[in-house]
Regions:
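Bacterial Sec-dependent N-terminal signal peptides
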Residues: 1-24
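Short S/T/G/P-rich N-terminal loop/turn motif that feeds into the first structured element of a domain
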Residues: 20-246
């Protein structure tokens, strides 16, 4: 129960250099305000994070404000990178009480999840640590057959392949749910430095990306390899633009 209270998302949203045995995982959750007290919640979360999740004696915690998507107006709190073994350590009574006083007093937590980064699908040339501003594209995987996630991964992988071949000046991290759920999910995380990134309409990818994609894969490949696959094997995409609260 307590571990669920302090569970988190995004994802996911931090990256480190991996060894062959290592993995990058984030535990996260959304925080929905109870009475619209933005400043109180922000101050409370930052206070709690500094005291218990500063990164010196364990994983670091981060807070983002969600600007777009189904959870717009809420916050996303993520801890990571974490290992499964971190969950073996019980939280102290003081830790739990501090969370209750500084966070759950102002917000309801929901959407707890563990997300693991897929290195084969990820393109992260600069090995960024944390994206202060990020676009999170969520793919809801259709259920009923493993072919749905396999085909989506193939489509997402074809994009990563072109990003590598063109030495793209962006990053795109891909995460998958660590535990099987009723509705599986793939998350594509694009860090950005300015909202101007969205003016060309590509929403994360380089402005000339699809031109390069079809040059490499053939005319009509964008629709065939990506568009049709997403339509057939997913239940839609949501786009969440988040900015870090510091």
């Amino acid at each position: 129960m307590i571990k669920k209270i302090l569970g988190m998302f995004i994802p996911i949203i931090t990256c480190i250099t991996l060894s062959a045995q290592d993995y990058v995982m984030f535990q996260s959750q959304y925080l929905e305000l109870r009475n619209g007290e933005h400043s109180a919640l922000q101050a409370g979360v930052l206070k709690h994070n500094k005291k218990y999740h500063g990164g010196s004696n364990g994983p670091k915690a981060y807070l983002w404000y969600v600007h777009t998507g189904p959870n717009a107006g809420q916050y996303n709190w993520a801890l990571g990178p974490v290992k499964f073994s971190h969950m073996d350590k019980a939280l102290s009574a003081a830790h739990i009480k501090d969370w209750e006083n500084n966070v759950s007093k102002y917000a309801r937590s929901h959407g707890h999840t563990f997300m693991i980064r897929d290195e084969n699908l990820t393109y992260n040339p600069q090995n960024e640590i944390v994206g202060e501003n990020i676009l999170v594209k969520r793919f809801k995987v259709k259920q009923g057959s493993p072919i749905h996630v396999q085909e989506l991964e193939k489509a997402i992988g074809s994009i990563a392949d072109v990003l590598r071949k063109t030495n793209a000046k962006i990053a795109r991290r891909v995460y998958k749910t660590a535990f099987r759920q009723k509705v599986g999910e793939l998350q594509l995380v694009y860090p950005f430095s300015s909202w101007e990134r969205f003016e060309d309409g590509t929403q994360g990818l380089p402005a000339d990306f699809w031109e390069s994609y079809e040059k490499i894969n053939g005319r009509g490949s964008q629709q065939k390899n990506v568009g049709d696959i997403i339509e057939k094997h997913s239940n839609g995409i949501t786009n969440e633009v988040m900015t870090m609260v510091k």
